[in-house]
C-alpha cells in the first residue's frame, strides 16, 4: 500500500487535534480511508469519546513524512481535555473543507492570504497567549479572525486580555479588518449560550453574551458543518457583500446611501443586507436604522440553513425583514464551485521525492 496525500492529512489532523470524532473524520474523508489506517494500526478509536487518535506507529510515519510538526504531546484522557480537543477539531475540519490551509505551527504562517492557526499548535507547544480562550486564528479575504467556541455552559472570558493578545500577536500581519468568530456545532448551540439568562458577574470576566453586546469588532456566528464551510468560503472573497448583492439583485441593484454602511444595497426602496456572514449585530443595526428612516422592513439574503434556523424566526416572523435564500447559481457565480475542498487522491511524496508505503512501519 502506498500512502496518499489524503492518508497523510488524516494523520496530520490527529497530530494537530489529538482527538477527532469518528463521525467528523469520516465526514471529511471516506470510511474506507479511515478504516485502512486503523487496520494498519496507525490510528485507533478511543471508545469512551468515539474519537480517533494517533498511535506510536502513526506518529513515526508522520515524522518520516514531514520535517516540521507541532510538538508531540501524549493525549490526555481527562473528559474536559478530550472535549476541548474534539471541539478544536470541529473548527479545523470545517476550515479545511473551506479550502484554507490548516496544518500550521506559528503565527508567521498567517501572513499568507488564506491560513488557519489552531491554538493547540501555536508556537510548537509553547503558549504565548497566556490563559486566553481563543481556539484558532483565521486569515481569509480581507479579515483576520479570532475564533472562539461558544456553546451552552462554556463559561466566561477576560475580553480585554483576549483583544490585547489578538492585536499584539497579529499586528505585523496585513489584514484590513479584525473580527471575531463564535463557532459551535450549530447556530442553535451558539444562540443557546447567547440567549441564556446570564448570572451577574462580580469579576473582570464576562459572559459571551456580554462580549457579544459590547464588542466593537465585527462578530460572525459559524456552525461547524457544510453551511459553515460555505460561509467561510464567502468570507474569503474580498468585498463579498457587494459582489453577492450585485449577483443576486442584478439590474435591480441600487447602491446604498453613503452614510448607511450597514446596508449592502437598496432593493425596491428597502434596505438590502447580505446576511450570509451571520453578523447578527449588523442586521440588528440595519433594522434599527431602517426604522429611524421610516422604513418598516429590510430585506435579507442568506444561506438556506441560516434562514431556516435563525433568520426566519428572528426577523421574518417578527415582521422586521423579508428573508430570501441565496440560490446555488448565485453561489457558483461568486465561488466557482460550492463543493467542499477535497485533497487529491494521489501518492504522497516526501521532500526527497520518495513515496511512503507500509514496510517502513515494520521497523521498531
Protein language model annotation of sequence segments:
Residues 140-146, 151-235:
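Long low-complexity, intrinsically disordered regions
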Residues 26-44:
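Short amphipathic alpha-helical interaction segments
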Residues 76-174:
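Exposed, interaction-prone assembly regions rather than primary DNA-binding/catalytic cores
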Residues 91, 125-137, 174-178, 198-200, ...:
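Long, low-complexity interaction regions most often at the N-terminus
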Residues 1-28:
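Short amphipathic alpha-helical interface segments
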Residues 2-4, 22, 195-364:
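Non-catalytic C-terminal interaction segments of nucleic acid-processing enzymes
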Residues 67-78:
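A short, surface-exposed helix-loop junction/capping segment
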Amino acid at each position: 500500500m502506498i500512502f496518499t496525500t489524503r492518508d497523510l492529512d488524516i494523520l496530520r489532523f490527529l497530530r494537530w487535534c489529538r482527538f477527532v470524532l469518528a463521525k467528523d473524520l469520516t465526514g471529511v474523508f471516506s470510511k474506507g480511508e479511515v478504516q485502512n489506517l486503523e487496520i494498519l494500526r496507525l490510528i485507533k478509536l478511543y471508545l469512551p469519546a468515539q474519537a480517533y487518535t494517533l498511535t506510536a506507529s502513526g506518529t513515526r510515519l508522520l515524522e518520516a513524512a514531514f520535517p516540521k510538526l507541532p510538538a508531540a504531546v501524549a493525549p490526555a484522557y481527562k473528559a474536559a481535555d478530550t472535549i476541548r480537543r474534539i471541539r478544536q477539531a470541529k473548527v479545523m475540519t470545517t476550515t479545511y473543507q473551506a479550502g484554507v490551509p490548516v496544518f500550521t505551527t506559528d503565527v508567521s504562517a498567517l501572513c499568507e492570504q488564506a491560513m488557519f492557526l489552531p491554538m493547540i499548535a501555536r508556537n510548537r507547544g509553547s503558549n504565548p497567549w497566556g490563559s486566553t480562550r481563543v481556539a484558532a486564528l483565521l486569515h481569509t479575504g480581507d479579515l483576520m479572525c479570532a475564533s472562539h467556541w461558544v456553546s451552552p455552559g462554556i463559561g466566561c472570558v477576560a475580553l480585554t486580555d483576549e483583544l490585547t493578545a489578538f492585536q499584539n500577536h497579529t499586528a505585523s500581519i496585513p489584514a484590513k479588518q479584525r473580527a471575531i468568530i463564535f463557532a459551535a456545532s450549530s447556530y442553535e448551540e451558539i444562540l443557546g449560550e447567547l440567549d441564556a439568562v446570564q448570572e451577574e458577574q462580580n469579576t473582570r470576566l464576562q459572559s459571551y453574551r456580554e462580549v457579544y453586546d459590547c464588542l466593537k469588532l465585527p462578530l460572525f456566528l459559524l456552525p461547524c458543518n457544510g453551511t459553515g464551510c460555505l460561509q467561510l468560503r464567502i468570507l474569503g472573497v474580498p468585498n463579498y457583500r457587494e459582489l453577492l448583492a450585485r449577483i443576486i439583485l442584478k439590474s435591480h441593484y441600487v447602491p446604498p446611501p453613503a452614510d448607511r454602511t450597514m446596508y449592502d444595497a437598496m432593493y425596491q426602496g428597502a434596505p438590502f443586507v447580505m446576511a450570509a456572514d451571520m453578523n447578527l449585530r449588523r442586521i440588528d443595526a440595519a433594522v434599527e436604522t431602517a426604522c429611524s428612516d421610516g422604513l418598516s422592513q429590510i430585506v435579507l439574503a442568506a444561506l438556506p440553513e441560516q434562514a431556516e434556523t435563525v433568520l426566519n424566526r428572528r426577523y421574518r416572523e417578527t415582521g422586521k425583514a423579508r428573508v430570501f435564500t441565496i440560490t446555488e447559481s448565485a453561489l457558483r457565480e461568486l465561488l466557482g464551485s460550492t463543493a467542499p475542498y477535497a485533497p487529491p487522491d494521489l501518492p504522497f511524496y516526501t521532500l526527497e521525492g520518495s513515496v511512503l508505503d507500509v514496510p517502513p512501519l515494520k521497523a521498531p
